[in-house]
Amino acid sequence: MLSRGGSAVDAAVAMMLVSCAAETIFTGLGGGGFATVYDAATTQVRCLDFFVSVPGLGGKLPSPATSIEVIFIGQHVPYEIGPATVAVPGIPAGAHYLWQRWGRLPWATVTAPGREASYGTPFPAMHAQVLPRVAAAMCVGEGIEVYQRSDGSYLQAGDPLRHPDHHRAYELMLRDPRAFYHGAYADALVVAVSNGGALSQEDLDAYHVIESTPRSVRVNDFTVHARGNDLDDLLGTMERVAPVVAGDPTTDARSAAALIDALRAPTKRAETTNIVAVDDHGNGCAITTSLGLGSGVWVPGYGVHLNSMLGEGELIRGLVHPGVRMGSMMSPLIALDDHGQLAAIAGAAGGSRIRPALVQVVLRMLRGAAPQEAIDAPRLAALPDLVRLEPGFFSQVIRSLESDGYKTAIADHRDPYFGGVSALSPLGAGADPRRSGFVIML
């Protein structure tokens, strides 16, 4: 997209649509997301909310959901799937809104890579490692054909990932993205969730993208912008962490302890995908999307797996009402210097590890590290009763933490559990090997 003269948003939307076909254990057209966009000409930052909304405007009440368990880093974590967990998807509306607002290239050009990917892509090795953990949600209904071989075993690295009829959804995206909310596709979606779900045509009619001014905080000599109403208060955490984490947590025990205390949060699992792009004019766009764990409900004839956001316990904090947006940890961010120029753009995937991953990576970047260096550095995740650390923390740091009463567990290797970050700065680009990330520099 960029080599054709496209904008950062053209590139980011194209990548998002590809990810919805090629990374379908993490995201898809049946999910939702957020975007943060920087306009270099005006030095303004805008946030877009195209996350899922709570269904029920048609008056239908959901039936009980189906309870499952997934094993994540040795822990059995309860979730719910089924029609009752499906919220109103936002990705089709969000993709088109972004392009209409900031795109340069024809819509057909922007959607073409996604349409090509919808016919099948090689299954990534990291996804093959994750699939057995989430099979209880993925290998249901049409997902059996998608994610399992003919002998019943799970897809392996390099196997073709193909959703039958998925190309029909991408052809619809090309012709008219609004058709995901009205007409034959919408009818099929409503029927798919009708046995227990609350989603109706009234919910689809009411869905709209929300554009807003971001919240901002000062971190060192930079202003960091993000949507500001994420469930884990990313910006507030960054503002608190920067003054107390003076050194490198991998080598300095005091900095490690301060980081842990600021990041204490419960562990839950949610899958997300993140994308960042910067164009030749200096404009930037970061997008984070998610399917949740996946509901096991598919839109027949279109190959679209629907989200399970209403079954994600960590997203339900208090009462939820029909028509309102659900909360999320996703929070793509942009940091500007004192001249309003782009200093860093980043986002992360990983549910409740989004905040710790972004805080650790962006803090390193704002202190002079190149994006890939910051992403490759070992990370920690601070749970209420345990600190999980990646390999690479100095042994004296670990001993000091344990002597101060922190219970620690060292991972065998870098793991998707610790989040997947993608980032750009004037020093280059970085993508996370923990989640098979990659960089394209033009």
Regions found by a protein language model. Give the residues of each.
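Noncatalytic scaffold domains of N-terminal-nucleophile
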Residues: 3-4, 8-175, 180-182, 187-224
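Short beta-strand scaffold segments in enzyme catalytic cores
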Residues: 27, 31-39, 215, 273-278, ...
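C-terminal catalytic domains of large/alpha subunits in multi-subunit enzymes
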Residues: 209, 251-269, 279-280, 312, ...
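Internal maturation/activation junctions in enzymes
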Residues: 222, 228, 233-290, 302, ...
